Amino acid sequence: MINGLRILHYVSPVRFDKTGLFQHEFDSNYKVVEKTISFLPRCHHYVVVPKKHNIPDTRDNVTFINYPYSRDLLANRSYFDGVTFRNLFDFRYMDFDFVFCHQPEMLYNILVSFNDKRYGQNMNRFLFFHWVDCSQSRASSAIPPAYMRQLEAINLCDNVFFHTDIASEWLGKNFKNEQSTTFNHDYIKDKTQTFPISADELQDIEPFDIEHENVLVFNHRWAKSTGVNRMMEYIDGLDDFKIWATDYQAPKEYIGSNLNRGQYRYLLENSLGSMSFVDSYATWNLSIQDGLSVKKPVLVYDQPAMRKVVGDDYPLFFKTKDEFHTQVKNLKQMGNFTWDIPNHDEKFAYNIIKSISNIMSKPRKHIPKDANNWLYCILNGIKYKHDIAKQVQPNLQLNSVWQYIRRYLLEIGINDNTNSPFVSYSIPNNIREDVEKMVKDVDLELRPMTIKQKTFTKKHDWF
């Protein structure tokens, strides 16, 4: 179990309603953030979220930090308000051991913002690729390529997480023509871990009047990348069936509904089945797992990433229009359909924990200067980072050695209260005697506390 770490999550929000409210419950990128939090319950998580949200704030080990993300999908990959971002954090009281960056293009900006505060020298970096930039993933040829920024981030990170072991191959498709650099796929693969994810359980159900029979659900975004063009081509001739698109931006003839989670489950359970037409670029898919979770058949266009989700032996793949029509017409006789898929979350959790453990277990060359002075303060009841630094290193902003001291403290077993947004150290009883021996020669005169120890009555009073 990973204990005592503080992790900054820079998210990749893609789902907003018409009022600008972040729809976290429908945002597949944000679901990955929540999964990593659940995998690391003994860590404190600082989550940078859109200003307008209604994410439940009920966990002591999670602090939400509001930031003005752009609502535009493309702009979010390039827009960064460095002044606002760095002013969100007060490193007199806070520490980040890891940054989990869900927009790789932004990692350099994050590091520069922290460097302006002389912070981040030994902060480890994980990248999460929810999309890979290539011509197949861009909505238009007019969109400037971003793959060089993604490659830059890979150079700056410790580990890069792709949904599957084949997803990084999309980066290589940018190098068909000669350019200023080459594509070193082996370098990327050496840093790669995978984060396959399971769909969230659809718990509540809310009946409503569907008003149609023989419903086929298209539960993907209404976009070229999800195969809508092929879908519209293949459904030609299926006049006895009603296609129901769950994206409210879909044309009216496909209903384009805006259902809540309970209604969405009811629709799936009372349909003939759902379908996936992802036919080119893809790295993962949650929507096909939703239908399978309620024991309904899901017709899946045969694509390599989809095989990673449901397995190579899945019986409802199709390629041609004729194959699709045959499977659709068989749905009426199929009824309930059971197909077990791997526990993807279990694999994801293992890869996250293993990657963190590998970094934290690297041997240390020497004990940082002043580390024993910090231990001496903690042993004498001075627990907050700001208060310790005032005793040992008054010029905190001019000295970055305390970042390395923190890593050392965690390595030898000092506790950090991860239910507090502020760094708060204590010495466990099982190592107290050892710590007393380590500091027996410390010559540090503890000054009276001139600043009241940091306390808080709510989690967010520091920004």
For the regions a language model picked out, list residue spans one by one.
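N-terminal subdomain of nucleotide-sugar transferases
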Residues: M1-N54, D236
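Conserved donor-binding/catalytic core segment of Leloir-type glycosyltransferases
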Residues: R6-Y10, F161, A199, P207-T226, ...
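Short His-centered aromatic/hydrophobic patch
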Residues: C101-L107, W131
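A short, active-site helix/loop in glycosyltransferases that binds the activated sugar's phosphate group
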Residues: M148, N155-K189
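Nucleotide-sugar-dependent
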Residues: S276-L286, D302, R307-K308
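Short hydrophobic beta-strand element within catalytic cores of glycosyltransferases
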Residues: P297-V300
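Conserved acidic donor-binding segment of nucleotide-sugar-dependent glycosyltransferases
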Residues: D312-D322, L331-K332
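A charged, aromatic-enriched C-terminal amphipathic alpha-helix characteristic of glycosyltransferases
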Residues: K332-D370, N395-S400
